Amino acid sequence: MYFWEGGYQRALEFAQWKQSRGEIKEPMVLGAYIHLGRCFDLTDTWATTQLGHYYSRLASLLHREGEPIPRNRRARPGDHDLLLRNLDCAVLNFCLTQLAADTGKGRGHFQTVRGVFVEGEPAYPGARIHSRSHIQIAVRDPACILGYFLPAGGYTVSEE
């Protein structure tokens, strides 16, 4: 399960985008109390160093098997951002699986993954701060979700 950290408006925009694609009926945002537990935190240089290492291992493995390396892609022609993160997802999953195997701790070694995603246009000319950037948390172990809530000013949950 994926969550935006403190990003109500961005989460709502995502839900509205899903509605426009016919993937959901009613957009809404649900908050969650999350205990990060053993977190693979992509804002920590240890984690990004691991990703670089395991990317090399994955690339070598795919090359030996004659498989292409996945690529991050735009969702639609004309999109500025590479929203379809096939490469990032493959590297993260390979890295986490291999770290668990290498340490003998099994799949549950990392319960959550936390990272910054830079998206949108620059906030002002010359900026490296972008209009749709957000922190996202992937919860791999549902036990890390301690509870749910409706954010202040948010939509109500329908009875359907």
Language-model features: where?
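Cytochrome P450 catalytic domain signature, combining two hallmark sequence patches
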Residues: 18-29
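Active-site and NAD+-binding cores of ADP-ribose-processing enzymes
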Residues: 27-160
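Extended catalytic/binding region for NAD+/ADP-ribose chemistry, centered on the ART fold
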Residues: 1-18
